[in-house]
Amino acid sequence: CDITDTQALCAHIKEIDKNYRVTVLVNNAGVGYYGLHEELNPKKIQKMVRTNLEAPMILTQQLLRTLKKNRGTVLNISSVTAAQSNPHGCAYGATKAGLSGFAKSLFDEVRKYGVRVITIQPDMAKTDLYRNADFCEGEEEASYLLPEEVAEAAAFALAQREGLVVTEITVKPQFHRIRRK
C-alpha cells in the first residue's frame, strides 16, 4: 500500500484492524532527500512530509482505539536529526522533529489507557536512505549503525515490563564520520 495515498491507506488499515488483533503499530517508513534546501523541489518536500510525518499520524489515528482496547504500543522510528541541526537535510530533519514531537504529546494523551509510545532515534545507518545524497556513511564499522542494531533497540524498549515505558532511545555509532560518494 502506498502510505502517501490516504484513502488507500485508511482502507487497508480498516481491513487489517478487522481481521487481526493489532497490538503494535510500527511507523518505520521513511524517505530523505538531501542537499541545500533551496535546491529541493516541492514534490520532494511533500513526499518527505507525507511519508515521514503525515502517514504515521494517520496510521496512529486510525488504530488508536484498537491500541487503547488492546493496551498496545506505537513504535516510531524517527532520527537523531529530530533534535539537532541538519544542514543539507533540514526538511528531512523537520519531518523527524515533527514525528518525535507528535510521539511525546501522544504518549501523554494515551498513557492513562495503558498505551505505550516509543520513539527510536537512530543516527546514520547502513541503509538505502542516503541513496539520493552526495554523501554516505564512513567506511569503518564504528561510523554507522546496522539496521539490526536499531531493531535491537526497539526490541529492548518493547520488552519492558507492563507499567514501564522507555519513551525514547537515541542510538549512535561511536564515530561521526561521513564521506563523499
Predicted regions: what they are:
Residues 1-11, 42:
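The beta1-alpha1 cofactor-binding region of Rossmann-like NAD(H)/NADP(H)-dependent oxidoreductases
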Residues 28-34:
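Conserved NAD(P)H cofactor-binding loop of Rossmann-fold oxidoreductase domains
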Residues 36-37, 44-46:
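Substrate-binding pocket helix/loop in short-chain dehydrogenase/reductase
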Residues 60, 95:
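Active-site helix of classical SDR
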Residues 65, 104, 108-112:
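Alpha-helical segment proximal to the catalytic Tyr-Lys
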Residues 79:
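Residue(s) in the substrate-gating loop at a strand-loop-helix junction
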Residues 119-120, 137-179:
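C-terminal helical subdomain
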